[in-house]
Amino acid sequence: MSKEKNIEDVLLMKGMNMNSVRLSHYPADPEFLEACDSLGLYVMDELGGWHGKYDTPTGVRLIEGMIERDVNHPSIIWWSNGNEKGWNTELDGEFHKYDPQKRPVIHPQGNFSGFETMHYRSYGESQNYMRLPEIFMPTEFLHGLYDGGHGAGLYDYWEMMRKHPRCIGGF
């Protein structure tokens, strides 16, 4: 995409009151990261992939490449060790080998590094987890596929999340 389109995308996100983006399903285009840097959109930079973890030798090479490419972008405030069940905890230490800032490494759909990021928690489960000491930051929200379509709506989740000081939003 062009520089202008990347800027337009970031402005569109900010116009929807978003202050961060997870790069799991968004290409890690250097122009997009430049737009995030200049316009103030925080970034969770995530190893690509879908649902299966990388073996350690492959993961090490991918982490090294991702961090060497993206390390100088101030908008990146978290590294993510893969989508859903696609992470390999043996790789966690690799992130800090290449990042002199030692930004937090998180695992979407898990509880690591003080962040509770589990995908698709029900409304009741979310209430319980917000009482724990970890920062509550779901990286995907529940939808009808998992609760038969009878769960709380996004508005209900946001209202609940606003009341808890350890909840910092979601993706």
Predicted features by range, described:
Residues 1-3:
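Active-site mouth loops of central-metabolism enzymes
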Residues 7-12, 20-171:
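Substrate-binding/catalytic cleft of secreted carbohydrate-active enzymes
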